[in-house]
Structure formats: structure tokens, C-alpha cells
């Protein structure tokens, strides 16, 4: 039995497809290094809607040991005028084996799909929203387990 979680790319795009850019590349790792911790702060892109600037930023904290749980934290910041309800942000992507995932920030919830270790997992519909100045801040949380490759 061997466990592999090879490197992969993660790209994201802003709401409505205004911008798309690669934001990070995950390094290869194996069970000898239990946890990969990658504190990131990305500005995924910004655009204007009715004169209001929308900014997508992603504090990303990835704990992705090949054996164990994986979690990714995302958030998005948008003007309150842009929504009739708090921002619901998340992303979907595939990690491992060089797969590329694309972010989906917008209404509803997205999930994380992991192919790197042979298992899929999706972000539960867990939101905790609060108002920060003129923006809504709503983190998304995802967890799952890598599978084993025999």
C-alpha cells in the first residue's frame, strides 16, 4: 500500500468570469511530512459593478496530509449593495496528479473535489457570516480524507 498526493495547480476566477489567474501550486508531499501548511493571502481579482469595487480574497490554510483530513478555508469580500443576502463564497477544484481546479465564487455553495488520493469530498453548507464595514465576510470550510492507492 502506498500513499501519494502529487503536486497540483489551483486556479480561481472571480464572479462572472471577470478575471482568472493561477494563485498557487501545491508541492508534493508524502506521509513522512504529515501536514502541509500553506498560509496564503491571494487577491483573486477585482472588478466593478455599479461603481462598487468587488474584491475576492482568499486566506487559504491547507492541511492536506496524504493520510488524514484536509481542510481549506476561503472567504470573499463584496459590497453589501451587490447582494440582497450575505455573500456565499467557496471554490471547487481537483487537487493532485497535476489536475487544475477553478474557483466558483457566487451564490450558492461550491465544494472541493479531491482526485489526488482517489477520494472525493465536498464542502458542507457551513457558513458563518458577519458584516465587516461595507462588506460581507463569509468563510467556507471544507474537510475530507485522502484515500489510499494500493
Swiss-Prot record:
Kindly state one GO CC term assigned in the UniProt record: cytosol
InterPro entries per the UniProt record, alphabetical: KRTAP_PMG
Where does this protein have coiled-coil stretches?
none
Q: Does the keyword Glycoprotein apply?
A: no
Q: Which UniProt keywords apply?
A: Keratin
Q: Does the keyword Ligase apply?
A: no
Summed up, the tissue specificity of this protein is: Expressed at high levels in skin and at lower levels in the developing mammary gland.
- Please report which protein family the annotation says this sequence is part of: Belongs to the PMG family.
Quaternary structure (record)? Interacts with hair keratins.
Task of the protein: In the hair cortex, hair keratin intermediate filaments are embedded in an interfilamentous matrix, consisting of hair keratin-associated proteins (KRTAP), which are essential for the formation of a rigid and resistant hair shaft through their extensive disulfide bond cross-linking with abundant cysteine residues of hair keratins. The matrix proteins include the high-sulfur and high-glycine-tyrosine keratins.
Q: Know the name of this protein? A: Keratin-associated protein 15-1
Amino acid at each position: 500500500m502506498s500513499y501519494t498526493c502529487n503536486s497540483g495547480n489551483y486556479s480561481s476566477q472571480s464572479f462572472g468570469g471577470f478575471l482568472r489567474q493561477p494563485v498557487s501550486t501545491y508541492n508534493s508531499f508524502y506521509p513522512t511530512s504529515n501536514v502541509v501548511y500553506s498560509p496564503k493571502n491571494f487577491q483573486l481579482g477585482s472588478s466593478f459593478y455599479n461603481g462598487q469595487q468587488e474584491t475576492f480574497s482568499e486566506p487559504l490554510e491547507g492541511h492536506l496530509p496524504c493520510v488524514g483530513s484536509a481542510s481549506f478555508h476561503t472567504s470573499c469580500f463584496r459590497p453589501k449593495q451587490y447582494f440582497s443576502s450575505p455573500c456565499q463564497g467557496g471554490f471547487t477544484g481537483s487537487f493532485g496528479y497535476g489536475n487544475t481546479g477553478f474557483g466558483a465564487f457566487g451564490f450558492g455553495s461550491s465544494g472541493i473535489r479531491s482526485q489526488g488520493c482517489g477520494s472525493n469530498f465536498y464542502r458542507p453548507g457551513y457558513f458563518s457570516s458577519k458584516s465587516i464595514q461595507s462588506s460581507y465576510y463569509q468563510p467556507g470550510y471544507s474537510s475530507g480524507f485522502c484515500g489510499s492507492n494500493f
